[in-house]
Amino acid sequence: MRFTFIAAKKAEHTVTILCRCLRVTRSGFYAWQRRPESTHARDDRRLKVLVRASFEESTHRYGSPRIHEDLLEQDEHVSRKRVIRLMQEDGLVARLRKRYKLTTMSDHDQPVAANLLDRQFEAEAPNQRWVGDTTEFVIGSSGKLYLAAILDLFSRFIVGWAVSAVNDRHLTIKALEMALKRRCPEIGLLHHSDQGCTYASEDYQTILAARGITCSMSRRGNCYDNAVMEAFFSTVKHELADRFDSCGDAKMALFDYIEVFYNQRRRHSTLGQVSPAAYERRAIEEGMDAMENRTERGFPQRPHPSIFSEKEEGRTTQTT
C-alpha cells in the first residue's frame, strides 16, 4: 500500500521525500515498480474502468450497491466489498442527501378524505394505488419552482408530473391529467395525497370522482402516511439538485431525471434493484406467460387488462 501511494504521488513530490516520510527505501520502491503486475491488480484496473463508467453514467448518483448491480448485470463476478474498495481508491463518492422543505398547505375549509391507504405502500398490480405530493425548488437567489408528481405504488413509476412557479390546484391537476392520459386507469383506483388545499380542492376532487377514483388523505401533519412520495422527492434532490439558475434549467433537468433516468434506468432497492420500467415489463411478460400456461392446460383465456396503455386514435399502445 505504501509503494502504491508513492507511485500515485510521485508527480507531486520527489520519490526520496515520499520514501523518507513512509519509512521505506528507494531501492525497495524501484524493485516493486519493476515487478510484473499481478493478475489481481490487473483485474482491479479493468474493474475500475467499469465502476467509473457506471458512476459517470448515473451522473454521480450511484453508490456501491447500484454500481455492484450494474457489474453483476454485465456478468462480472465481483463482491460488494471489492466495489466499495475500488470506489474509495478512485475517490468516487455519490452525492450527499439533504433534507427538504415540506409544502403542504392544509389550512383550508375543504372536505378531507379518510386515510384509506393506511401506509399500505405495496400494490399487486399497476393502477391500484397512486400517491401524489408537491415539493419546491429554489430558482436563482430567491425564486421558487414547484413540482407535483404522482407515483404508482406497484412499480414506483412516476405516471404524472408537472412544474409551475405557483403552487395551486392547476399544478396538481396538470400532473393528474398527465397520469390519467398516460395510464387510462379502470374504476377503483385509490389516490392518496396529503390534506393540502390543492388536492382537497373541488376541481381536483371532481376529476377523481368522474373517473371513479377513490380519494385517500394522510392524517394532518403526518408525513409518514405518504412516506413513498417523501422518499421520492428526497431522492430527486439528493441525486439531481434542490436549486437551479433558472426555471428553464430546472424544467429540462427534471424532465431528463424523471423520464429518462428515474423511470427508465434508475435501479430501485424496493424493486430488487431494477428500474420501474423494467419492473413493469417483467410484470407484463410474467402475466402473458401465465396466460399461455392457462391456454395450454385447456382453461379459457381471460382478457388481458390494458394496465400500461395510452389510447390514441382508437388503438392501444404499451407505455413504459
Question: Where are the model-predicted features located?
Answer:
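Charged DNA-binding/catalytic regions of mobile-element recombinases
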Residues: 1-320
